[in-house]
C-alpha cells in the first residue's frame, strides 16, 4: 500500500522513482540497503520498523550504518507526551514511574543523531498534530512510520521542503497516458517490448502493471513530449486491445486479467 501511494506521490512531483525494496527485520540487511540506496539515489524513504517492540529495528540499524548514536530527542518526547492519547488499557500508565510501557514509548523517540549537524536538518516535524518526526540520516535517508495514514500525511507535509530541490516541481513537464487492457501481461509483452524500443529515444517510458484480482490490467506511457505521446494512442489501443482511460479501474467490469 505504501509503495503504491509513494509511486503516485513521486509521479505527482516529477520524481523518477528508481527502486522499491522490501527488507526483512534483519539489522545487517537494513544496514546494507541503507548504505547502498543512500549512495545511489538522491531521495531515500523507509517505511516501518520504528514502533515500540523488539522487532522495530529501523532506527538502530540505520544509526549503526553510519556510526551514529541513538539519542532521546527532547522535542519529540515533549510532543509525544502532549499529543499521545492514552488507551483505556493504559489508564495506569505514568511518565513519572519507570515501567516496560514507559521504556517502550521512549524507544520510539530515540533517534539516529549526528552531533555535527543542526537539529532541524535531521529531525523534521511536518504536521502539528503528530509527534512522530521524520528522522533524516546521511542527508537523504528519510525514516517514516509504516502506518499508511501517517506515512501519507507526513510525506504530504514534507512536500514543501522537497519542491525547491526539484528540477521539475510537481511534475508539470511530465505527462502520463493510461490504457486499460483485458489481456494478461503475457499477451501484451511482445507489443510493449517493440513499442518501448521505438519510443525510448523520445524519452518515453512504457509500463505494464498487472492488477491482481481485477478484470483489467494497466499499460502506461510516461514522458515529456505530450504531442508525440498523443500520436501513439491509437497504436497502443490496438496493440493492447484496450482503450485509453483517465484512471485505473474505471472499467473493471469488463475483460479478464488471468493467463490461461
Q: Predicted segments — roles?
A:
Residues 139-237:
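An accessory alpha-helical subdomain
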Residues 57-166:
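Proline/glycine-rich low-complexity loops and linkers
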Residues 4-65, 85:
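N-terminal small/polar loop signature for handling phosphorylated ligands or for N-terminal nucleophile
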Residues 16-19, 116, 205:
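Conserved beta-strand segments of alpha/beta enzyme cores
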Residues 239-260:
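Conserved short beta-strand edge segments in small beta-sheet-based binding/regulatory domains
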Residues 1:
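Glycine-rich, flexible N-terminal cofactor/catalytic loop recognition
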Residues 22-25, 75, 183:
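Short beta->alpha linker loops
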Amino acid at each position: 500500500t505504501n509503495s503504491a501511494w509513494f509511486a503516485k506521490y513521486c509521479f505527482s512531483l516529477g520524481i523518477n522513482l528508481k527502486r522499491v525494496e522490501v527488507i526483512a527485520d534483519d539489522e545487517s540487511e537494513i544496514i546494507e540497503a541503507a548504505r547502498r540506496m543512500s549512495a545511489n539515489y538522491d531521495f531515500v524513504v523507509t517505511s516501518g520498523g520504528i514502533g515500540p517492540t523488539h522487532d522495530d529495528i529501523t532506527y538502530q540499524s540505520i544509526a549503526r550504518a553510519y556510526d551514529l548514536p541513538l539519542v532521546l530527542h527532547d522535542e519529540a518526547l515533549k510532543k509525544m507526551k502532549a499529543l499521545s492519547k492514552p488507551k483505556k488499557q493504559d489508564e495506569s500508565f505514568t511518565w513519572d514511574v519507570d515501567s516496560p510501557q514507559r521504556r517502550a514509548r521512549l524507544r520510539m523517540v530515540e533517534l539516529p543523531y549526528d552531533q555535527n549537524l543542526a537539529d532541524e536538518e535531521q529531525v523534521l516535524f511536518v504536521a502539528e498534530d503528530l509527534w512522530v518526526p521524520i528522522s533524516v540520516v546521511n542527508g537523504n535517508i528519510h525514516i517514516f512510520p509504516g502506518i499508511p495514514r501517517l506515512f501519507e500525511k507526513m510525506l504530504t507535509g514534507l512536500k514543501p521542503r522537497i519542491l525547491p530541490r526539484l528540477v521539475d516541481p510537481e511534475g508539470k513537464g511530465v505527462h502520463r497516458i493510461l490504457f486499460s487492457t483485458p489481456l494478461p501481461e503475457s499477451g501484451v509483452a511482445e507489443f510493449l517490448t517493440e513499442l518501448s524500443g521505438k519510443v525510448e529515444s523520445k524519452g518515453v517510458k512504457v509500463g505494464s502493471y498487472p492488477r491482481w484480482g481485477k478484470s483489467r490490467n494497466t499499460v502506461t506511457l510516461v514522458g515529456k513530449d505530450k504531442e508525440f505521446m498523443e500520436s501513439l494512442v491509437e497504436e497502443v489501443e490496438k496493440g493492447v486491445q484496450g482503450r485509453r482511460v483517465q484512471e485505473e479501474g474505471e472499467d473493471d467490469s469488463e475483460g479478464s486479467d488471468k493467463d490461461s
